[in-house]
Regions:
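The catalytic "switch" region of P-loop NTPases
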Residues: 193-196, 200-203, 213-214, 223-291, ...
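Post-Walker A helix-loop "phosphate-sensing" segment adjacent to the P-loop in P-loop NTPases
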Residues: 125-137, 168-169
């Protein structure tokens, strides 16, 4: 049996991994002297900037090791037995999962923090060979296949999307055959997809998994994923936002066990965020260059809530607005204009509150003692009513002098 793991590139780590993950588009300082159109076009390069961080390094390691375990399984004798079971499922006969799916995991994090970018960069490094081809036996294996969960959580839609992704890489016609088959039910499609995964897929990444939340077909899709995990034996990564956590954790134990993995939140105001700001600030296309200081860096953090995607959009749009209105500089004014006009839709999702000071000096808060008040028990409502009647006064007004009275219109 051929060792498919030998086709993988060596696993990177440390400084070598950081350099491989980082993407810094070329930047010429004299671009600031170019015409407006040229600078506006070049400004889009800021979206290509990607810096390695703890999240991207961890995602790379998780994907690499997941692919490694998946390829190791393809060399075992259990693969042949599982393939026979999958053929039974295609023929609508009773079948069982043999390989198991302990290698599945999740990558959960807020939108815009760089999950998809980290996954894409990691897949590029892992898939140095787009298709692994062996002769004896002849086999074509795609190291990593990435698909998206259908917006309506359609089970059939996801299964066909997996087949379509394989066809686009190998030039096969699995999807067309499945769509035109007379027995193209969900059960037969699961068997077909599981067999395709065994033969041709190393690592399957399913993005936007949060689409299963709130959909009628969500539970069915979750059970379908669990069956594919058990029947294919490959590593499957489920990628989504935190909204999917209650669905996965509160569901069946088998699904929750196969959904363990990585969880990320927006960046803290630390050295990693400061390095990102410093790097992005180098890509200036306005005529008057400015330097980044601590005050500006804190302002940027407050108005992006530590979300790298929002930070990039803010710096891009601030320069674009400044170039178009003739200011030609990055200032608080241009940044505020971009934040208020271009990022208005994100305001409900951005907390523009300053982080609490880390100083050890604390202000002493003096709380004055409240004046003692009389309790209701010290007054007799009966006596108040009698006195009001004798003086021919409004009873409610008299009661309000001693207790809180709320009048309700009937």
């Amino acid at each position: 049996m051929i060792d498919l793991c030998s086709y993988l590139p060596p696993m990177l780590y440390g400084k070598e991994l950081d350099e491989a993950l980082t993407v810094l588009p070329p930047y010429a300082p004299n671009i600031v002297h170019a015409d407006t159109a040229t600078r506006l076009v070049a400004l889009s390069d800021i979206y290509r900037v990607f810096l390695s961080n703890a999240m991207s390094r961890e995602i790379y390691a998780k994907l690499y090791l997941g692919l490694l375990r998946s390829l190791q399984k393809k060399g075992s004798q259990l693969v042949t037995r599982q393939y026979v079971e999958n053929q039974k499922a295609i023929q609508m006969e009773a079948s069982a999962g043999i390989l198991g799916g302990a290698d599945s995991f999740t990558i959960i994090g807020a939108s815009g923090i760089g999950k998809s970018s980290s996954i894409s960069r990691s897949i590029q490094l892992i898939s140095k060979t787009p298709i692994i081809v062996t002769d004896k036996p002849y086999r074509q294996v795609i190291p990593c296949v990435m698909v998206q969960t259908p917006f309506d959580a359609s089970v059939k839609g996801l299964l066909l999307e997996i087949l379509r992704a394989v066809d686009s890489k190998l030039g096969s016609d699995y999807c067309a055959k499945a769509m035109h088959s007379r027995n193209a039910t969900v059960d037969t499609l699961i068997g077909c997809v599981a067999s395709v995964c065994i033969n041709h897929i190393g690592l399957l990444v399913i993005d936007e998994i949060q689409h299963i939340v709130g959909q009628k077909a969500g539970d069915a899709l979750a059970r379908c994923l669990m069956q594919i995990i058990n029947s294919s034996g490959i590593s499957i990564a489920l990628v989504g936002t935190p909204s999917v956590i209650p669905f996965l954790s509160d569901g069946e134990y088998q699904l929750a066990r196969r959904s363990l993995g990585l969880y990320y939140e927006p960046m803290e105001y630390d050295l990693s965020f400061q390095n990102l700001c410093t790097t992005l600030y180098r890509y200036q296309y306005v005529k008057s260059r400015t330097e980044l200081d601590e005050s500006m860096m804190r302002w940027l953090y407050e108005h992006c809530s530590g979300n790298p995607s929002v930070l990039v959009s803010l710096l891009h749009d601030a320069q674009e607005c400044s170039i178009l209105d003739g200011q030609e500089t990055i200032s608080y004014e241009s940044l505020s204009t971009a934040y208020n006009k271009r990022l208005r839709m994100l305001h409900p999702h951005i907390k523009t509150t300053r982080k609490p000071s880390t100083s050890k000096v604390k202000q002493e808060v003096v709380i004055s003692k409240a004046e003692p008040t009389k309790t209701i028990e010290e007054f007799s409502i009966v006596d108040i009513v009698k006195d009001a009647k004798k003086a021919q006064q409004d009873i409610v007004s008299c009661l309000k002098r001693h207790i809180s009275v709320e009048e309700v219109r009937i």
